[in-house]
């Protein structure tokens, strides 16, 4: 990875709508102050200079803003724009294609829930596959489970891995675990080639269903996941916000109910810096031993001496595990309507 690239707040360009970015072939952009051009786009607000504003057609008519103290890194990989900045209130922030992926302050709520909701729902998981998750946070959490013998991670963008290791060492610490096998490549292709019944659990830590992550929300991908799971194996995938994306969630639930013949459930957690402040997960099991996702059956290894460089859990516990499946009435009505 290239050396640290720093820029002043006022040198950053105004955010374009995401569709415009997809049509752009990496050309230069005009900066806010009109002083020259740089190639890396950002989401700095043109209304309030010095603030990052997350703007996307995925959540029209609204934006979430964070005050920027310093830009730590700007880069463009083969797949997406990557930015790291120091915020005034949430620590360091990782942004991919203009969308916040994690902040030091609240990443625990996402990483812990997407990992422990599935892994604590089955007994003694041994082989785990992570699709995406290049920042390493899911790896950190999987490593808390002493029964796990093999952790494969397939991340398409090596720049994300390198940036996480440099700027988010407490998140990327998972890469230090000897059980981890990193594959830089396309998760869709990797799963197509995976042997049937290989994994006890698959965790899909994807970004929004736009650009390189789009295929991770489509039916053929879920079919590949189901084939790669052992009987009664589980999958947990990022499944958008119930406040913003019920149409997307409805499609995901419908696809999952068609494919996974075990349990199919939707859960959610609170992440302040994600759009609407919440993010959801689809949890499904393959045909075989019944899985009740709402009742955790496995405990997390809390012996910190056996977990290299791990801090204690900050968000997950058994009570919040069960509570995560309690849905507001409007969401429950839509999701239940897709029941077979």
Swiss-Prot record:
It catalyses: S-adenosyl 3-(methylsulfanyl)propylamine + putrescine = S-methyl-5'-thioadenosine + spermidine + H(+). GO terms for biological process: spermidine biosynthetic process. S-adenosyl 3-(methylsulfanyl)propylamine binds at residues 80, 111, 135, 155, 186-187, 205. GO terms for cellular component: cytosol; mitochondrion; plasma membrane. Pfam families: Spermine_synt_N, Spermine_synth. Gene3D superfamilies: Spermidine synthase, tetramerisation domain (2.30.140.10), Vaccinia Virus protein VP39 (3.40.50.150). Residues 1-41 are annotated as: Disordered. Putrescine binds at residues 110, 205-208, 274. GO terms for molecular function: spermidine synthase activity. SUPFAM superfamilies: S-adenosyl-L-methionine-dependent methyltransferases. Its EC number is 2.5.1.16. The active site is at residue 205. Pathway: Amine and polyamine biosynthesis; spermidine biosynthesis; spermidine from putrescine: step 1/1. The modification N-acetylserine is found at residue 2. The keyword Acetylation applies. InterPro entries: PABS, PABS_CS, SAM-dependent_MTases_sf, Spermi_synthase, Spermi_synthase_euk, Spermidine_synt_N, Spermidine_synt_N_sf. Belongs to the spermidine/spermine synthase family. PANTHER family: SPERMIDINE SYNTHASE, SPERMIDINE/SPERMINE SYNTHASE. HAMAP family: Spermidine_synth. Heterodimer. Component of a multiprotein complex. Interacts with SPMS and SPDSYN1. This is Spermidine synthase 2. The gene is SPDSYN2.
């Amino acid at each position: 990875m290239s050396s640290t690239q720093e820029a002043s707040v006022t040198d950053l360009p105004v955010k374009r709508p995401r569709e415009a970015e997809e049509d752009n072939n990496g050309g230069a952009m005009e900066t806010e102050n009109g002083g020259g051009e740089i190639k890396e786009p950002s989401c700095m607000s043109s209304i309030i200079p010095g603030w990052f504003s997350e703007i996307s057609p995925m959540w029209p008519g609204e934006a979430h803003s964070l005050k920027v103290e310093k830009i730590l890194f700007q880069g463009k990989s083969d797949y997406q724009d990557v930015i790291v900045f120091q915020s005034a209130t949430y620590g360091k922030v990782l942004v991919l294609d203009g969308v916040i992926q994690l902040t030091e302050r609240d990443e625990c709520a996402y990483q812990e829930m997407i990992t422990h909701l599935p892994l604590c729902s089955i007994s003694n998981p041994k082989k785990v596959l992570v699709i995406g998750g290049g920042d390493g946070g899911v790896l950190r959490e999987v490593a808390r489970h002493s029964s796990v013998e093999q952790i494969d991670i397939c991340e398409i963008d090596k720049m994300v891995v390198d940036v996480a290791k440099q700027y988010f060492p407490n998140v990327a610490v998972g890469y230090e675990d000897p059980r981890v096998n990193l594959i830089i490549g396309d998760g869709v292709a990797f799963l197509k080639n995976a042997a049937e019944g290989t994994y006890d659990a698959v965790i899909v830590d994807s970004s929004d269903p736009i650009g390189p992550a789009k295929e991770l929300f489509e039916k053929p991908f879920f079919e590949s996941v189901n084939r790669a799971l052992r009987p009664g194996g589980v999958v947990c995938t990022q499944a958008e916000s119930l406040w913003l994306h019920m149409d997307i969630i409805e499609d995901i639930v419908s696809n999952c109910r068609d494919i996974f013949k075990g349990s199919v459930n939707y859960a959610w957690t609170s992440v302040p810096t994600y759009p609407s402040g919440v993010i959801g997960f689809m949890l499904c099991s393959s045909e075989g031993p019944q899985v009740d996702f709402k009742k955790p059956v496995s405990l997390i290894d809390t012996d910190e001496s056996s977990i290299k460089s791990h801090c204690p859990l900050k968000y997950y516990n058994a009570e919040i595990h069960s509570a995560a499946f309690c849905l507001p009435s409007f969401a429950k009505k839509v999701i239940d309507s897709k029941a077979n």
